Amino acid sequence: MPIKSDRWIRRMALEHGMIEPFVDHQVRRGVISYGLTSYGYDMRVTDHFKVFTNVYNALVDPKQFDPRSFVDIRADYVDIPPNSFALAQSLEYFRIPRTVSCIVIGKSSYARCGIIINVTPLEPEWEGHVTIEISNTTPLPARIYAHEGIGQVLFLESDEPCEVSYADKKGKYQGQTGIVLPRIDP
């Protein structure tokens, strides 16, 4: 399952709409970098964040998640409380080809500050805005900047198409826009 290069990513983004909007180079000056890299794509985060709070003393249960556990914030940056987390959304909309699976890893600028990014794999034929979990592992507030890089998407291509894609199984997060909270199929 080889990793795909900048040439392949550019071609798929421009000819097949795999990444929209697409930045065909890496933007680095004065920002957390974003755009096309040698073997990946640094996606950005929007200005919409859901910051975890324990105002209602709710239990965190993925099967019965209480949306009141979050405070909605729209801003150029967000400060995540110590030892807490926020959810955010990628600026880019992704359309993953049937023979490709993607993993997302955090940006070193954030990781070196104790900020960890978690995203589950982008499966074959999944499409949507990525919901991103951002953890502040430090005992201090941690700042995240909107419209700047948040994680690098690596594209891994199989030597054959999968038998059942995310679209085929009608995955519950297919076509998601906005920040999507946990869902359980009925």
Swiss-Prot record:
What is this enzyme's class at the first EC digit?
hydrolase
Task: Please name the GO terms of the biological process aspect recorded for this protein, alphabetically.
Answer: dUMP biosynthetic process; dUTP biosynthetic process; nucleobase-containing small molecule interconversion
Reactions the enzyme catalyzes: dCTP + H2O + H(+) = dUTP + NH4(+)
Q: Which residues of the sequence carry a binding annotation for dCTP?
A: 107-112, 152, 166, 176
Reply yes or no: does the keyword DNA-binding apply. Answer: no
InterPro entries (UniProt xref): dCTP_deaminase, dUTPase-like_sf, dUTPase_trimeric
Q: Which UniProt keywords apply?
A: Hydrolase, Nucleotide metabolism, Nucleotide-binding
EC number(s) on record?
A: 3.5.4.13
Coiled-coil-forming residues are none
Is this entry keyworded Amino-acid biosynthesis?
no
Q: What does this protein do?
A: Catalyzes the deamination of dCTP to dUTP.
The record, for NCBIfam families, names: dCTP_deam
Q: Which family does it belong to?
A: Belongs to the dCTP deaminase family.
How the protein assembles, per its UniProt entry? Homotrimer.
Q: What is this protein called?
A: dCTP deaminase
